[in-house]
Amino acid sequence: MFLKSEGYGAWNGVGTKANSPGDADVLILGIPFDGGAGGQRGAAFAPGRVRSMTGRLKSTSRRGDDLSSIRILDIGDVDVSTFDAMKTFDAIECSCSAVLDGTDSTLVSIGGDHSVTHPILKAVAKRGRTGVIWFDAHPDLLDTYHGFSFSHGSALRRAIETT
């Protein structure tokens, strides 16, 4: 795997810390990368910022559901290469594949601009049939953006081709 850390464990009392990816209901993976963004940067900061806010989370949902029995494992961040998007995409796909291998866990990725969608979906699709539900102000269906096929502007197009 290409992870920067050994992980962060459970999320401040929300859920129960799983011992391994195979024990987890939910796997959390940070992707601190915004090298595919064409405009304002900042998605690379999302994993750390989201984790810093988990202290505000409660173990009961707004509907009253008890979430404390959900087994969560935060496995850390993908080790990204700020100046080499293709190397980063390989690391994302390899990390996602490795942590999902042999599990029924749900992967939740945090951070990254839209360009990280393609390598995540490639890894998830190895498990079987995969679908995508896309919410965005625009469809991100460009074939290329400034000559790059894996930009934020082509994420949904690559997802359609992958799934």
Sequence positions of predicted segments:
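Conserved alpha-helical scaffold segments that buttress catalytic/binding sites
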Residues: 2-163
